[in-house]
């Protein structure tokens, strides 16, 4: 016998005082307690009573030297006509219960089992007599929710039996339904459970009463069809072995030609389809003209040399000179490099382009980084005012000019043949050109951070100009000027002017080209590419 009687439970005992007062009668003050004597009173916490005291309500009275049960406890109370006894039916039923638990009201119940039919019938009878459900709950020691549920079911269906009225729901996951669900899933792997339910109704497999729910279909797909869809070990052994995955298929997404195929042959197969040979080479089918290989010029090189063949280690290792030529093919066609060695020009190859090519980078380089299209020197003005027309730039190849200590070999062909260091006007062969407008001594240059020195300020230039004008003028130039400052200034100007109306040696009129050596190599202020950080 199982009785879970802990500290939280209540062991109901019969109050001897209440029973004695009920037996004494109204004269002894028992009229007020007569009704209460029929029920269990005074619950006491923490005290364990006997099985009968917890389940069998007895109304005891004192008489005959012992306690005896009152015969009218199960019947109506004299003070309350029509009110039946509180424990008229609970006594025999409780005696039949051999196991169970005790609820808060003191009644014995079995968890998970329905209430006995006799108690159900008694609840309905008491309700028909007009007793409130709360009073029925206290009298029969049944929870209020159970009483209300039984009465509501009786009012709706007229039945006091537990469980569903029409019986349990019939089985819906029949083998036929499972077979159709499997067929639907195999035909369309992405089908939803509610779509399967609609197709079962549309095909007449089920009707609206026995069609499985969406959750049932999902459970069938997960438990039954999911396990059946996976092939067994025997079925897996019959399948052909999968092709080995190439290690670089996920990088190169386009078809590859086979090394045994003819040179330049192209394949149109899909990347995942294996080719005729066991090895694959570099790609040949290019999606667009803006790929990385086209930008670097690899496609042009490959079209000239054909598809590379060989082992995987040598398929991607061309010679260095071929790659150097590949890098040049990406640029526009430019003039020849005049016999210079390729390694010497690898670092500066971008600067040997024509002026039109270099003008494209004008937004990224400073103004003094490259000369203008008609300018041969860095510190000179446009060359048309000083140089005679010559062959196009760069001219034919000439003898190399490589003075000792020069870092880069410069060939004479890179300098214009007509770019002499002695102007024809100073030699007297041609008339003097028109005078140019005079500007301040510090003239504008392409690089404002380095102002150009005044023209004619070098002693070597003045001495050479005086020797060219008159060999006997050196003594006059060395002697101090006699007279006022005005006379001395005029004498110096006349001495430096030279014969035949040559141009005066003023800073504004002095040309930019230095006599010797070449100014763009030996001038200390020349802005080379090394100074620009290239």
From Swiss-Prot:
The record's subcellular location field reads: Nucleus
Q: Which domain of life is it from?
A: Eukaryota
Q: What is this protein called?
A: Paired box protein Pax-1
Q: Which gene encodes it?
A: PAX1
| PAI subdomain as annotated region, ranges | 101-157
Known DNA-binding region:
98-224
Q: Which GO cellular component terms, listed alphabetically, does the Swiss-Prot or TrEMBL entry include?
A: chromatin; nucleus
User: What residue spans carry the region label Disordered?
Assistant: 424-480, 492-511
Task: Cite the source lineage.
Answer: Eukaryota, Metazoa, Chordata, Craniata, Vertebrata
Q: Which UniProt keywords apply?
A: Activator, Deafness, Developmental protein, Disease variant, DNA-binding, Intellectual disability, Nucleus, Paired box, Transcription, Transcription regulation
Tell me which Gene3D superfamilies the record gives. Answer: Winged helix-like DNA-binding domain superfamily/Winged helix DNA-binding domain
SUPFAM superfamilies in the cross-refs: Homeodomain-like
Question: Is Chaperone tagged as a keyword?
Answer: no
Q: What is the purpose of this protein? A: This protein is a transcriptional activator. It may play a role in the formation of segmented structures of the embryo. May play an important role in the normal development of the vertebral column.
What InterPro entries has UniProt attached to this entry? Homeodomain-like_sf, PAIRED_DNA-bd_dom, Paired_dom, PAX_fam, WH-like_DNA-bd_sf
Q: Which GO terms describe its molecular function?
A: DNA-binding transcription factor activity, RNA polymerase II-specific; RNA polymerase II cis-regulatory region sequence-specific DNA binding; sequence-specific double-stranded DNA binding
Q: Which PANTHER family does its entry note?
A: PAIRED BOX PROTEIN PAX-1, PAIRED BOX PROTEIN PAX-6-RELATED-RELATED
Annotated segments matching region RED subdomain: 176-224
* Record annotation: effect of changing residue 139 to H: Found in a patient with neural tube defects; uncertain significance
GO process annotations (BP): embryo development ending in birth or egg hatching; regulation of transcription by RNA polymerase II; skeletal system development; transcription by RNA polymerase II
What disease is this protein tied to?
Otofaciocervical syndrome 2, with T-cell deficiency: An autosomal recessive disorder characterized by facial dysmorphism, cup-shaped low-set ears, preauricular fistulas, hearing loss, branchial defects, skeletal anomalies including vertebral defects, low-set clavicles, winged scapulae, sloping shoulders, and mild intellectual disability. Some patients also exhibit altered thymus development with T-cell immunodeficiency.
**SMART domains according to UniProt:** PAX (SM00351)
Annotated source species:
Homo sapiens
Chief location of this protein within or outside the cell: nucleus
A Pfam family cross-referenced in the UniProt record is: PAX
């Amino acid at each position: 016998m199982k009785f879970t009687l802990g500290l939280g439970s209540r062991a109901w005992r019969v109050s001897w005082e209440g029973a004695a007062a009920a037996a004494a009668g109204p004269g002894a003050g028992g009229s007020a307690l007569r009704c209460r004597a029929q029920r269990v009173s005074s619950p006491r916490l923490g005290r364990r009573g006997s099985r009968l005291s917890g389940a069998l309500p007895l109304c005891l009275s004192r008489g005959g030297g012992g306690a005896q049960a009152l015969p009218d406890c199960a019947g109506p109370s004299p003070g309350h006509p029509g009110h039946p006894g509180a424990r008229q039916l609970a006594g025999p039923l409780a005696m039949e219960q051999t196991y169970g638990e005790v609820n808060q009201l003191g009644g014995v119940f079995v968890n998970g089992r329905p209430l006995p039919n006799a108690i159900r019938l008694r609840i309905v009878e008491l309700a028909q007599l007009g007793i409130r459900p709360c009073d029925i709950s206290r009298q029969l020691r049944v929870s209020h929710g159970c009483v209300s549920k039984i009465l509501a079911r009786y009012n709706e269906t007229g039945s006091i039996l537990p469980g569903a009225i029409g019986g349990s729901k019939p089985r819906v996951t029949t083998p036929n339904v499972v077979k159709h669900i499997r067929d639907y899933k195999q035909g369309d792997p992405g089908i939803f459970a509610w779509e399967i339910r609609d197709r079962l109704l549309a095909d007449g497999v089920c009707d609206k009463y026995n069609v499985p729910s969406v959750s049932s279909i999902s459970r069938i797909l997960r438990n039954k069809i999911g396990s059946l869809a996976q092939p067994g070990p025997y079925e897996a052994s019959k399948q052909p072995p999968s092709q080995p995955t190439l290690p670089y298929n996920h990088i190169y997404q386009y078809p590859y030609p086979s090394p045994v195929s003819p040179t330049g042959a192209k394949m149109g197969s899909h990347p995942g389809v294996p080719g005729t040979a066991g090895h694959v080479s570099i790609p040949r089918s290019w999606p667009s003209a803006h790929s990385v290989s086209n930008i670097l010029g690899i496609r042009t090189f490959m079209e000239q040399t054909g598809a590379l063949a060989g082992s995987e280690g040598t398929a991607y290792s061309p010679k260095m000179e071929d790659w150097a030529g590949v890098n040049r093919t990406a640029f526009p066609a430019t003039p020849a490099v005049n016999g210079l060695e390729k390694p010497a020009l690898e670092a500066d190859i971008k600067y040997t382009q024509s002026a039109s090519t270099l003008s494209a980078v004008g937004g990224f380089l400073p103004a003094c980084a490259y000369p203008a299209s008609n300018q041969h020197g860095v510190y000179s003005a446009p060359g048309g005012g000083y140089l005679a027309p010559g062959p196009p730039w760069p001219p034919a190849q000439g003898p190399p000019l490589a003075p000792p200590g020069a870092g880069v070999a410069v060939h004479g062909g890179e300098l214009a043949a007509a770019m002499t260091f002695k102007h024809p006007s100073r030699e007297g062969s041609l008339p003097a050109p028109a005078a140019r407008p005079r500007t301040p001594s510090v003239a504008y240059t392409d690089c404002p951070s380095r102002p150009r020195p005044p023209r004619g300020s070098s002693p070597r230039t003045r001495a050479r100009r005086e020797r060219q004008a008159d060999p006997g003028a050196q003594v006059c130039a060395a002697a101090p000027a006699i007279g006022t400052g005005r006379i001395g200034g005029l004498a110096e100007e006349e001495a430096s002017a030279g014969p035949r109306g040559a141009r005066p040696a003023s800073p504004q009129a002095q040309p930019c080209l230095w006599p010797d050596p070449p100014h763009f190599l030996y001038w200390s202020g020349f802005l080379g590419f090394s100074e620009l950080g290239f």
